[in-house]
């Protein structure tokens, strides 16, 4: 049976760093964020729906202003739910297609920030949660994405509380330390119940 690892965590917790480690191990990593970006590529059905729904505030279907869209949806839960209802089915369909293509792989990683929120945990045989401190998340978002503290906090609040995700995870990867600590945590999660290593 294929081992399907759902890799999730809070925003700016370090999922991509863990994903790169697993990719270097030779495991295919399917990236929900990339699939969502692809769904909103110029002139797709989804980008046309977004341009129609939000109007000039987000540009045109040929040239969406993703930063403006982010500011809107992370400050208005109703608008965020509308966008998620549009994008999540497209992302789910892409995952199902990619999983069918990779059916002969022994291990596949599904990197999905909103794994539980989108109901995509049903595609996984196990869940790995990448965790760090809320302070680190805020600092990373402000530095990486150029967000204000308030914008970063809005994005944190748009996701399930990390404790709720932790309760549903099979393995928690603490990414609040250095690179060596992260490698050790990933290795621990990679151990199989039967003792074989990753």
Curated annotation (Swiss-Prot):
Kindly list the positions annotated as binding ATP.
12-17
Q: Name a GO CC annotation attached to this entry.
A: cytoplasm
Alphabetically list the UniProt keywords.
Answer: ATP-binding, Coenzyme A biosynthesis, Cytoplasm, Kinase, Nucleotide-binding, Transferase
State the reactions this protein catalyses: 3'-dephospho-CoA + ATP = ADP + CoA + H(+)
Pathway(s) the chain acts in: Cofactor biosynthesis; coenzyme A biosynthesis; CoA from (R)-pantothenate: step 5/5
Query: What are the DPCK domain coordinates in residue numbering?
Result: 4-198
Enzyme class comes to transferase
- Which Gene Ontology BP annotations are present? coenzyme A biosynthetic process
Q: Which GO terms describe its molecular function?
A: ATP binding; dephospho-CoA kinase activity
E.C. number(s) listed in UniProt:
2.7.1.24
Q: Which family does it belong to?
A: Belongs to the CoaE family.
State the PANTHER family in the record: BIFUNCTIONAL COENZYME A SYNTHASE-RELATED (PTHR10695:SF46), DEPHOSPHO-COA KINASE-RELATED (PTHR10695)
Describe the function of this protein. Catalyzes the phosphorylation of the 3'-hydroxyl group of dephosphocoenzyme A to form coenzyme A.
Q: What is this protein called?
A: Dephospho-CoA kinase
Gene source species:
Parasynechococcus marenigrum (strain WH8102)
